Amino acid sequence: MNIKIVCVGKLKEKYFKDGIAEYVKRMSRFAKVKIVQVPDEKAPEKLSPAEMEQVKEIEGKRILDKIKDKEYVYVTAIKGKERTSEAFAKELSDLTTYGHSDITFVIGGSLGTSDAVNKRADDLISFGKFTMPHQLMRLVLIEQIYRAFMINSGSPYHK
């Protein structure tokens, strides 16, 4: 299985980098994991709704350029479907059973994802109604992917 995580912006904090690297290392026995960062669009603090959409569109084009047609795509979104860890693990298992070996997860920038990115998604996934920094979301997402692999392998990691 190939897991790709497409994220907007660079990760600067060492503690996030270290945590993500640890989970990527742990997952190497289950999947090849690739993290792709696309540049975030610089924008002033106060934006009009139209300017916000423009920023999301620019970042969205950068995201879509990194996604291939054959990839199954999850986009993280507050309005996405919430799942339990067990249900998510079953979904990943079912995807591979039905021939999806390339799975991509998208984490948008601070304003979210564009309509075009959301339309490209095969599924919108939510980790709750809380707003999180997108840097933290990377770590949360990768831990949940790892947890799914551990659930599917019968490991006691998930209690």
From Swiss-Prot:
It is an enzyme of class 2 (transferase). It comes from the Bacteria. Its EC number is 2.1.1.177. It catalyses: pseudouridine(1915) in 23S rRNA + S-adenosyl-L-methionine = N(3)-methylpseudouridine(1915) in 23S rRNA + S-adenosyl-L-homocysteine + H(+). S-adenosyl-L-methionine binds at G108. The keyword S-adenosyl-L-methionine applies. GO terms for cellular component: cytoplasm. InterPro entries: Alpha/beta_knot_MTases (IPR029028), RlmH-like (IPR003742), tRNA_m1G_MTases_N (IPR029026). Gene3D superfamilies: 3.40.1280.10. Disulfide bonds: none annotated. One of its GO terms (molecular function) is rRNA (pseudouridine-N3-)-methyltransferase activity. It is found in: Cytoplasm. Signal peptide: none annotated. Keywords: Cytoplasm, Methyltransferase, rRNA processing, S-adenosyl-L-methionine, Transferase. Specifically methylates the pseudouridine at position 1915 (m3Psi1915) in 23S rRNA. PANTHER family: METHYLTRANSFERASE (PTHR33603), RIBOSOMAL RNA LARGE SUBUNIT METHYLTRANSFERASE H (PTHR33603:SF1). Homodimer. HAMAP family: 23SrRNA_methyltr_H (MF_00658). Belongs to the RNA methyltransferase RlmH family. NCBIfam families: PRK00103.1-3, tRNA_RlmH_YbeA. This is Ribosomal RNA large subunit methyltransferase H.
